[in-house]
Amino acid sequence: MPQGLALYCFIAAGGATGACLRYFVTTSVDSLFGKHMPFGTLTVNVVGSFALALLYGVIERYDLSDSPYRALIGVGLLGAFTTFSTFSVETLTLLENELWLKAAANVFLNVGACLLAGWLAIELMKG
């Protein structure tokens, strides 16, 4: 595994890629489904949860704990791709607009779907 500056460069490269992917996915999903519900954020969080659980399964299965992929993909790319802060602000905005059902649905969909996606990835890795 890279150390020092090289490790931070791996994380930064993954983070830049993940941020650009998040922007692309959220704007694409929002343009398809509209902005009445934050489906773009839900999409990146669910896909990211699945991908991170899958990555950790691959790392464990193939004993890649010293691999730079954990930093590049897990911390950098998927860390920037998923977004808990945006989920929080979007939920608060729904609450401020007194859209109680949409706010509750956003919380339950994000938490439930992300947990389900992670579980599915883990089960796939058990194979």
Curated annotation (Swiss-Prot):
Alphabetic keyword roster: Cell inner membrane, Cell membrane, Ion channel, Ion transport, Membrane, Metal-binding, Sodium, Transmembrane, Transmembrane helix, Transport
TM regions (residue ranges): 1-21, 39-59, 72-92, 105-125
Record Pfam families: CRCB
Activity control: Na(+) is not transported, but it plays an essential structural role and its presence is essential for fluoride channel function.
GO biological process assignments: cellular detoxification of fluoride
Binding-site positions, Na(+): G79, T82
InterPro entries: FluC
Cellular location(s): Cell inner membrane
Cysteines joined through disulfide linkages: none
Reactions mediated catalytically: fluoride(in) = fluoride(out)
GO molecular function list: fluoride channel activity; metal ion binding
Cellular-component GO terms for this entry: plasma membrane
Highest rank taxon of the organism: Bacteria
Topology with respect to the bilayer: Multi-pass membrane protein
Protein family (similarity comment): Belongs to the fluoride channel Fluc/FEX (TC 1.A.43) family.
Function of the protein: Fluoride-specific ion channel. Important for reducing fluoride concentration in the cell, thus reducing its toxicity.
The name this protein goes by in its record: Fluoride-specific ion channel FluC
